[in-house]
Each structure stands twice: as structure tokens, then as C-alpha cells.
């Protein structure tokens, strides 16, 4: 993951040492004629155990970061802890939102695409990020994941640019065929990008 601690001009998620200068990276990628995407979550932690756009602390620093329960790249790591159970505690929305701060930071870095990942997707958090991205001066493609509920398809069209309709793909025929051949009901909600 790219995520480090909160800070900078907006108190947004900053990069860890693996990505020392996201703006420079963006400029290099754009110079090659490509676009640059980023991954985040409206939870306090992502599926990969890095910080997300919410926190239980008003300063945005999650307790596990304050307690030092992370590796050198600020990924959750607690010696002697139950890694999988502890990580599940991150899969929730915290008391404080830093969505606007994160969106402003990504716009400053010239990010082109956001994959916003949590499950189940809900209108409040979808719209919150939509509004934050639209308030920046950058056109950022907004993709939600995963398993966007079909019943809310009209909302996804209104507030996102793209959405994922299934869980992870596996290297089995059942997985490939169910993902590839059982998505017809989504067709009425497709359109040009």
C-alpha cells in the first residue's frame, strides 16, 4: 500500500517511504501518456490494513498507529495480536471523516482514478466522496468496489463513474463464468465513460 500517516497541507493521508513523492510520480506517469490511480476506503482501515478516510480520533490518527502497531510502511501489525481478527475491527466507519481532506490531496497530486473499496457500499459514503471529488478542480474517475448492490444501481450511475458488480475473481471456471456471463441485469445501467 501507498498509505502512511495523516499530515500535510490538508491533514490528508500521506505516502509512506515506498512512495516518497506522489506528485513527482504522477508527473512521470502523465509524461508517459498514462493515468495514475489510487486506492482508499471510507473505513478506518483498508482491506490491506492501511489507514482509510475515517478515524475514531479527531486528529485523524488511528489508535493502532498511535500505539505503534504498524510496520515501517504504516500497515497494521501487532506483535502477538490476532492479525485477521484485529484487521476486521478496521472494517467500519469511524467517528470522524477526512474524506474532503483526502480528495483535496489527491487532486493536488494529480491523481486520475480512485478505487474506493468497502462492503457493503452505502449511499451516504458514496455520495460523500462524490461531493468531495467534485469540489476539487480535478476530474478524478470515481470507482466503487466491491459487490455494489444491484438494487442501488440507479444511484451508482448518478454518483460514480464505475462500479464493481462482483466479488474477487478466482482461477476457476465457476468464478470466471459467473462473473463473465451473469451480469446482464446491469446492462441498462451501462453507458459511455
Where are these regions (language model features)?
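Residue-level signal for the start and early helices of compact helical domains
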Residues: 10, 97, 133, 154-156
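Glycan-recognition surfaces
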Residues: 73-79, 90, 124, 141-193
